[in-house]
Amino acid sequence: MEIRNIAIIAHVDHGKTTLVDRILHQTHVFRDNQETGDLIMDSNELERERGITIFSKNAAVVYNGVKINVIDTPGHADFGGEVERVLKMAGGVLLLVDAFEGPMPQTRFVLQKALHLNLKPIVVINKVDKPNCRPDEVHDAVFDLFYNLDATEEQLNFPTFYGSGKQGWFNDSLTPCEDITPLLDGILKYVPPPQVSEGTLQMQITSLDYSSFLGRIAIGEVSRGVIKENQPISLVQSDGSIKKTRAKELYVFEGMGKKKVTEVLAGDLCAVVGIEDFNIGDTIADFENPEALPTISVDEPTMSMLFGINNSPFYGRDGKFVTSRHIRDRLIKETEKNLALKVEDSENADSFLVYGRGILHLGILIETMRREGYELTVGQPQVLVKELLGKKCEPFETLVVDVPEEYASKVIDMVTRRKGELHVMETKGDIQHLEFDMPSRGLVGLRTQMLTNTAGEAVMNHRFNEYKPWKGTIPGRNNGVLIAKEAGTTTAYSLDKLQDRGFFFVDPGEEVYKGMIVGENNKPGDLVIQPNEGKKMSNMRASGSDAAVNIAPKRLMTLEECMEYIQQDECIEVTPNYIRMRKVILDEDERKKQAKKMSTEAA
């Protein structure tokens, strides 16, 4: 049976997962009466909620007697570690672009990697049923993007398909047709079958799966030879050492699941069970004369955060797992399948340093742990600094902002204050397209500020670029915070009197503790307030004169917003039911002593 391996590249929310749904339905993977639901590929609850793909997944369908392995890639640069490896398994890529938005920066990130690996591209312009869409302009924009990424002559000559995933059709022109058959025919026609060279077994491990029943499972493409069940093999590791072991069970992909087989031929993707201690990039080779394939590099982390046990006064109320041993085991387990993540012990026995690719990457991990019933405290995200050629260097990112013209000057002002440099400024209709080069540190907390200052109109995206010399200090949050003076339950009476001081993160009737951040001050500098004072019930006041209290509703903060909001001396308490911000040192006098000590040491 012939094989085609194809990866799908798309920006967040351009309809990649919907396209895969269509392919699965078209090739009758499901029985006609089977309930499937939408978003079949995004199996993780968090992925469905946010509409992003985090872990790459595989599906396989059979069309006209040819087996097509579909590989879904994460679109976000924070999961860059996933993307590169996954593309190694593919022979071609489907580049999916929104007919209105055109190619976006995250797409560019993945496409660049795909073109470097010499994959054959097919461009699919989706959502042509949307009003105001501009498929022809988008086609030209894609061509320019390919050209800017140094595509070869052959790659620039790419086939294009138009259609709507929602309505369920794709065609090689703008005329709607019955279904997505033209696209599937195109895949068979334009994507080359896997290139198989003669020789002994070689298979590179490009991705892994973990099951509590089978342990770690190695996934990759058999690039030559045949692998059989129970066959003795050599595992060639990235440092050149060779381990002799045995492939106990083999699985190939079928529909949405896996099917157990006795042998896998070259060119197909397979999952191997029973190999101990392997890493991404290792080669499974012949037992007698092993030959290694070149290793793959995984993107380095650019950010770190301190994860510790929850040591607030409300500790242990909501969570099932609260000890440092629980947190440690969970983080170590996460590193087995989340490869861009590193965990180290810190000086303190109760906390761990976790390194990741960015705020989104770490935020997803914290959110997942929270839902599993963990309680933890996390500190402010720190950017990793490197020494290059004797200079202190920090990670820089390319920031792309699309914003209505009237706000463009505000955006440029905000970004340049945070040490960003403007490189590109173009007008697209009534929208200004701006591109900046800026330090990753400057991006922390920028999104919330940007949305406030542009009335929610700005669309921003960023991707890691390279390490460059340190840019100096970057201004953080301008305003101070409001801190609870003592533990208790907030009352409408006190919050009403304190409203002119700023806005709150709590409503009346919520429990607070000493040192917890309950709001933002209107001015710079922190202010300790008493939000839980009740009204004196003496007979001196008329009973009805102050019954009506108008309090502005609290501001809701998501986990990522909290991570960007807090400063050096603050942390976030994360439990299954609450996300609270607090000072690291809860007692006000202790905080003052510490601040004094710091200033004398600095002097």
Feature map (PLM): residue ranges:
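Long insertion/accessory domains within large nucleic-acid-processing enzymes
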Residues: 253, 258-261, 438, 451-567, ...
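Interdomain boundary/hinge elements
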Residues: 35-39, 149-161, 194-204, 240-253, ...
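Canonical P-loop GTPase G-domain recognition
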Residues: 120, 130-189
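A short, contiguous, amphipathic alpha-helix enriched in charged residues
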Residues: 312-335, 548, 552
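Conserved structured catalytic cores and adjacent interaction surfaces
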Residues: 1-18, 77, 100-112, 118-120, ...
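P-loop NTPase switch module centered on the Walker A-proximal segment
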Residues: 1-103, 137, 141, 208-211
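Residue-level signature of catalytic and energy-coupling elements of molecular machines
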Residues: 13, 19, 51, 72, ...
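Conserved nucleotide-binding/hydrolysis modules and their immediate coupling elements
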Residues: 202-305, 315-317, 479, 488-538, ...
